[in-house]
């Protein structure tokens, strides 16, 4: 069976906090892997986790991205191609537009849409139109 992970589960697995709930989340994940289950993480959950790790856990962009990158290579875990493209951008922790913006543009592009934005930095990305 395939399960879509909520942000609350991803954060428990990435941070280990709070310990009791993180232990239960890890046990459920490990039991699922042993049973042959797969787990997917949506772009929205990846974005929420990225911001939450920084805001609530005091980690840097680079640390948040490293945690997500490491998690994405775990057994039975799948992220979207948009996530993979964004997270593997060289120096993504310093990039502008950043990780979430790149995931967004890639997601729209995947369905043939052009991203319409008022952010001038979006001109740096293919598949965008900037209103200015």
Residue ranges and their predicted role:
Residues 1-41, 56-63:
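Short, well-structured N-terminal submotif of metal-dependent ribonuclease cores
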Residues 5-6, 41-42, 97-101, 119-120, ...:
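Histidine- and aromatic-rich ligand-binding microenvironments
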Residues 9, 45, 85, 103-104, ...:
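Alpha-helix capping/helix-boundary segments
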Residues 9-10, 48-52, 70, 88:
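A general alpha-helix detector
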Residues 12-14, 52, 125:
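Residues that scaffold the ATP/ADP-binding catalytic core of kinase and kinase-like folds
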Residues 40-44, 66-94:
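Acidic catalytic patch
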Residues 50-76:
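Active-site-proximal, substrate-binding regions of enzyme catalytic domains
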Residues 105-132:
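Acidic, PIN/NYN-like endoribonuclease modules and their adjacent C-terminal/linker elements
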């Amino acid at each position: 069976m395939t399960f879509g992970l909520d942000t609350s589960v991803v954060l428990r697995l990435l941070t280990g906090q709070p310990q009791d709930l993180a232990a239960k989340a890890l046990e459920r994940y490990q039991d699922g892997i042993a049973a042959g289950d797969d787990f997917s993480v949506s772009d929205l959950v990846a974005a929420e986790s990225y911001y939450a790790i920084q805001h609530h856990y005091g980690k840097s962009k680079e640390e948040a991205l490293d945690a997500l990158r490491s998690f994405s290579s775990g057994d039975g875990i799948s992220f979207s191609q948009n996530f993979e493209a964004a997270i593997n951008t060289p120096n993504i922790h310093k990039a502008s537009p950043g990780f979430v913006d790149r995931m967004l543009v890639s997601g729209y592009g995947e369905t043939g849409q052009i991203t319409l934005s008022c952010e001038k930095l979006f001109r740096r990305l293919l598949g965008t139109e900037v209103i200015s």
